[in-house]
Amino acid sequence: MDLPSHSINAMKSMEVIDINTGTKLGLIKDLKIDTEEYKVISIILPGSKVGGWFSKGNDIEIDWTDIQKIGVDVILVNGDNLFVNKD
């Protein structure tokens, strides 16, 4: 049996949507990977940039367990536990 799979490049072009509000959260910027367990821990989305072109936005980190469905062109997530990374 073949399991559904997606490349990182394909996933980076999928819109991420919060299933609770219907809000478009954006596109995947990066993945956080556990290199000892060989699994994805979370996806990282660019945060909104308030204050101009050169301002740094706060990234949004979504735990992999909060991903509800990966479709053909969209990723549905439970946005109840969004974490804003203020690096």
From Swiss-Prot:
Superkingdom assignment: Bacteria
Database matches in SUPFAM superfamilies: PRC-barrel domain
Pfam families: PRC (PF05239)
InterPro entries: PRC-brl_dom, PRC_barrel-like_sf, Spore_YlmC/YmxH
Family the entry assigns: Belongs to the YlmC/YmxH family.
Protein name: Uncharacterized protein CA_C1697
Species in which this protein is naturally found: Clostridium acetobutylicum (strain ATCC 824 / DSM 792 / JCM 1419 / IAM 19013 / LMG 5710 / NBRC 13948 / NRRL B-527 / VKM B-1787 / 2291 / W)
Classification of source organism: Bacteria, Bacillati, Bacillota, Clostridia, Eubacteriales
